Amino acid sequence: MKKLLGLVVSCRMQKTVIVEVKTQVKHALYGKRIMKKKRYAVHDPEKKASLGELIWIRTCRPISKTKKWIYDSSANASQSSR
């Protein structure tokens, strides 16, 4: 099961939020570090995530054509519990 940390950029749909995940990759030839970002449709059945919040998402069975990730927990809540 994969887990990713991302930022909620849209929460207009019912039970779905769009999360943007940023990763740093190294260029194969030149070695420069490049920031890449990808947007995931995430299933959020209880509507816990809010716009601009950092959340953890994890893989799950395909829920629809684009939704293969599910809301796991808020990154802010997990940091405060440590």
From Swiss-Prot:
InterPro entries linked: NA-bd_OB-fold, Ribosomal_uS17, Ribosomal_uS17_bact/chlr
One Gene Ontology term from the biological process aspect of the record: translation
Disulfide bonds: none
UniProt keyword rRNA-binding, yes or no: yes
Localization annotation: Plastid, Chloroplast
Alphabetical UniProt keywords: Chloroplast, Plastid, Ribonucleoprotein, Ribosomal protein, RNA-binding, rRNA-binding
One Gene Ontology term of the molecular function aspect: structural constituent of ribosome
Keyword ATP-binding: no
GO cellular component, one term: chloroplast
Subunit organization: Part of the 30S ribosomal subunit.
Xref: PANTHER family: 40S RIBOSOMAL PROTEIN S11 FAMILY MEMBER, SMALL RIBOSOMAL SUBUNIT PROTEIN US17M
Function (record text): One of the primary rRNA binding proteins, it binds specifically to the 5'-end of 16S ribosomal RNA.
HAMAP family: Ribosomal_uS17_B
Family: Belongs to the universal ribosomal protein uS17 family.
The protein, known as: Small ribosomal subunit protein uS17c
Native source species: Cyanidioschyzon merolae (strain NIES-3377 / 10D)
